[in-house]
């Protein structure tokens, strides 16, 4: 929701100055904030289902800009606090030691304990979905811009290093759908 609203309504507001666009942004931020679970420390990505209690996708890092902006516009710090909490949990649980990222981390919605890192759009649970890696890079970069917390800058830089120095990145620097697709040691899930 964040990158959809910010790319459209925020740009419309910047171009026109029409404050009606700001109300859409703030309503969207309120809707996103309603999906926040304090025990988990993140916003819910998808409805709970048989597979996941509380799924959180790396794509959600793109939503945080909406929350940071709404905090500035409304003066309501809860939006900023939710964004920082979500970024902290993503930093802790989505990034692997090599700074590649899981697409989905499933949490216990009561205790906040991470249950499993996996994929829904990548090749396998232990592979790196290239678009998700890009979402993470953008999200951590933007969170650093908003907070000046160097942990986010380090995560963005290391995740970008993983991306641009990956041995499977084609010479045109345009990655395939997944960095590890069809490789030995990666089994589709």
Question: Where in the sequence are the language-model features?
Answer:
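Glycan-recognition and catalytic cores of secretory/periplasmic carbohydrate-active enzymes
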Residues: 1-189
